[in-house]
């Protein structure tokens, strides 16, 4: 633990989760799965081949082997189909789009991966240097809690009420302060609510792994623009890729955040494979919670059990899975 930060690694078969928690709440959840294409991970470097040049999009599509990525190009840059380029992933896939790439250098030879992006453990070391990760049952529970917090965040008692919503065009943040009976809000109260609200909004946006245009509807009017901008920089960070705008006359602060990881809601969208991974995680949690039990069995629908069986086998001889087609695909019973 360092500076109130806690780091967790849940290394359940099929999926590794890394979680960072601060005194304000969960800050990051990183997910790495068996079968993920390493060429699509943030920070991966590959030799790719340009397959299409799209002047209208100011870029080109690049074959990375198992998938394509999009390479933005300067207006006067020359590129042609078949050209080999060395590229780095600067934003992971989202909304049915492939990864966004950055040109490193011209290249030769076959399309290939040169260097995979950092693993979950490597990202945790970068984001929380020197903090020893917590593993086991507590790490599994932290992952569940972080995903729940991202979906239904709890506001601090007595603090501002902050709504953070994403549309296709932007992220909208609304900061409000619930009234206290018999007490009005003065200028200092509004300032404190806005500063605390910016911290909450920044934490939730990081946790949800969102980027793009952010519009923050601040509480009150007549804001000190310099103070608000300083508070926003403290909350969202000093990354030079973040663009901060002024507070406009309507009391709205705008900023632009770079996209990095795939949004959390996309990466955790339920399907049959995620159900199998969830089963393995629940079974692993039960095994860790009671090490005296000789046998722990998870019952689930047959379609899930077929995919889950290899993952369960990696948990050891105490773990078992049983097909039960009377159960819906969303239900798992651990016994």
Features from the language model and the residues they span:
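Extended, charged alpha/beta regions that create polyanion-binding interfaces
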Residues: 1-57, 63-71, 77-169, 320-335
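Conserved glycine-centered short motifs in functionally critical loops
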Residues: 60, 93, 159-333
């Amino acid at each position: 633990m360092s500076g109130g930060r806690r780091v967790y690694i849940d290394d359940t078969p099929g999926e590794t989760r890394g979680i960072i928690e601060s005194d304000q709440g969960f800050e990051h959840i990183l997910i790495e799965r068996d079968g993920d294409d390493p060429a699509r991970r943030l920070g991966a470097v590959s030799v790719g081949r340009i397959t299409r040049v799209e002047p209208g999009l100011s870029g080109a599509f690049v074959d990375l082997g198992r998938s394509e990525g999009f390479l933005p190009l300067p207006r006067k840059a020359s590129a042609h189909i078949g050209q080999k380029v060395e590229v780095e992933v600067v934003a992971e896939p989202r909304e049915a789009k492939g990864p966004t790439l950055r040109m490193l250098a011209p290249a030769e030879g076959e399309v290939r991966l040169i260097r995979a992006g950092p693993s979950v453990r490597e990202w945790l070391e970068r984001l929380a240097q020197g903090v020893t990760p917590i593993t086991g049952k507590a790490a599994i529970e932290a992952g569940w809690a972080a995903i729940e917090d991202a979906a239904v965040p709890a506001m601090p008692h007595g603090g501002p009420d902050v709504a953070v919503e994403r549309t296709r065009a932007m992220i909208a943040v609304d900061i409000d302060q619930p009234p206290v009976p018999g007490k009005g809000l003065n200028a200092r109260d509004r300032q404190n609510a806005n500063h605390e609200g910016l911290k909450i909004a920044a934490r939730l946006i990081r946790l949800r792994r969102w980027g793009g245009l952010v519009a923050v509807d601040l509480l009150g009017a007549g804001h000190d623009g310099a103070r608000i901008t300083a508070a926003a920089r403290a909350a969202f960070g000093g990354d030079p890729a973040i663009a901060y705008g002024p507070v406009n006359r309507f009391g709205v602060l705008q900023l632009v955040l770079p996209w990095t990881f795939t949004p959390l809601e996309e990466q955790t969208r339920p399907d049959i494979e995620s159900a199998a991974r969830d089963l393995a995680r629940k079974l692993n949690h039960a095994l860790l919670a009671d090490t005296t039990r000789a046998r722990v069995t998870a019952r689930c629908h047959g379609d899930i059990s077929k995919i889950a069986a290899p993952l369960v086998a990696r948990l050891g001889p105490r773990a078992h899975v049983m097909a039960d087609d009377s159960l819906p695909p969303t239900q798992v019973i651990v016994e």
